[in-house]
Amino acid sequence: MIQLNNGNKKILQIAIPSIVSNITVPLLGLIDVTIVGHLGSAAYIGAIAVGGMLFNIIYWIFGFLRMGTSGMTSQAYGRHDLNEVTRLLLRSVGVGLFIAFTLLALQYPIERIAFTFIQTTEEVEHLAGLYFRICIWGAPAVLGLYSFAGWYIGMQNSRFPMYIAITQNIVNIAVSLLLVYGLGMKIEGVAIGTLTAQYAGLVMAYLLWLRYYSTLRKRIEWHSFFDKQAMYRFFQVNRDIFFRTICLVAVTVFFTSAGAAQGEVVLAVNTLLMQLFTLFSYIMDGFAYAGEALAGRYIGANNQKALHKTVRQLFGWGLGLSLSFTLLYSIGGQSFLGLLTDETTVIHASESYFYWVLAIPLAGFSAFLFDGIFIGATATHLMLKAMIVASVSFFLIYYGFRGTMGNHALWMAFITYLLLRGVMQGVMGRNILGYKTSKKD
């Protein structure tokens, strides 16, 4: 039996539930696609794909609510500052609700602008519009859940976000099946099922807080909610994460767009190969969350020894997992692609690009882990700098080599982008490891 020391146990106690939560995220969309896939028209599947893409982009951009809340909460937890821990949750939820109601107020221009750029059939656009106009009302629940998830992780508790994610999937399946097949509501039923699951998750997050953190209610101080210095710090951290996310979205969307411009076979190949990156990212993000929680905790406690030990252990896990994924993909990667498609043209075309996939784990694992450590340290400005340099390099490499290398230039640019993020943050990370809580990033 493998014996784990206390540090590794703490890492896994946060990482494993986070990995489970990550894996359940795409299940919400997969469930919707599976249900509408039996309604007799491909337009329903297209509508879910388009609507899901819109919400992925919108909510991805506002993911700073989870990350910023996690880093600052973990530091306050490390300082045993329960008043600040409470204020951070209120601040984050308040900002999230403000953004959500702004999205609701602007839903019609957002929809019109989005469909100006999305070229699809009239039927798909009509159905996607129905899906969007129902699901957009879930914005308060989704952004509220971001705040709760970040707060729970900052409190060293990733189990609650996992419980919430599992509950959401169960509710989504039950309500969607009832409305679609029981009441014949078709895509509206799927949208309402998703909406119901989102609010069920928010209610559960609040009830868990009341049940297990009720002692914090007496620490609510509304007069300190708008403390200027604290609000400035909150928005400073989240501003950096917001722009970092914009860079990440730009690279991700461009990767798909550049592949599509090279034809449907190349687009299909890139889409399939990126599934292997996505699978790896779900695992590494779990350890990044552990980095957020533990790095922030030890920085808040001024415990550099524990911080250094945690970073070493995180990178031990990261290196081991990246080597394992490289070996796994080299042995069974092509077989995995065969499970995703039976198009021999696509599978054959993917063979010439597969070595780029083998480079992803070793090139990318440090970027994931340093992201978590930097978020825990609230060193978001440095993280943004690394992302800007890596993103600019991505575009320079692609446009510099696409004429001679074609799609290989796109993959080379992506691998370099991952590698540069890790290398730059590794260099800057030396300063972070020497941080005191009073030191600015």
What are the roles of these predicted feature ranges?
Residues 134-153, 161-169, 190-205, 285-288, ...:
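Short runs within selected transmembrane alpha-helices of multi-pass transporters and secretion channels
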Residues 30-34, 147-151, 173-178, 206, ...:
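Alpha-helical transmembrane segments of multipass membrane proteins
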Residues 38-41, 75, 154, 183, ...:
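Membrane-helix boundary and inter-helical linker elements of multi-pass secondary transporters
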Residues 1-15, 73-140, 182-242, 295-360, ...:
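Short alpha-helical transmembrane segments in multi-pass integral membrane proteins
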Residues 13-32, 134, 145, 167-168, ...:
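Transmembrane helical elements of multi-pass membrane transporters/channels
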